[in-house]
């Protein structure tokens, strides 16, 4: 499967520029910083870390010339596209998908209360993915990589 195969099925073509990717990195950084604040509830910290994860997945799609539509399932699609958009292996994507499922259970069913360990695991996974995105941009799309110091 390629990203082109998903055109019309949740993805559409959309060019990105360096400023847009810089904004993604700024948002990701803020959400990660907030997710580490011990004064915030665990479920809010989990949500913030998940939002950072989603921003990375969306930024990776944008760097490849795509974006999700607003159709149902767009968050899942963005995460499941990570092997093609960022070169992630299937095992890491499955782990990220588990975080998405937990967040959905909490958001839509009030059936998930994250532990401190689960929040920390998600934050670590997102920090790693943020580094992966930066390295991918530097190697594959230096024209979109945020300038040093940003």
Regions found by a protein language model. Give the residues of each.
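Terminal alpha-helical segments
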Residues: 1-150
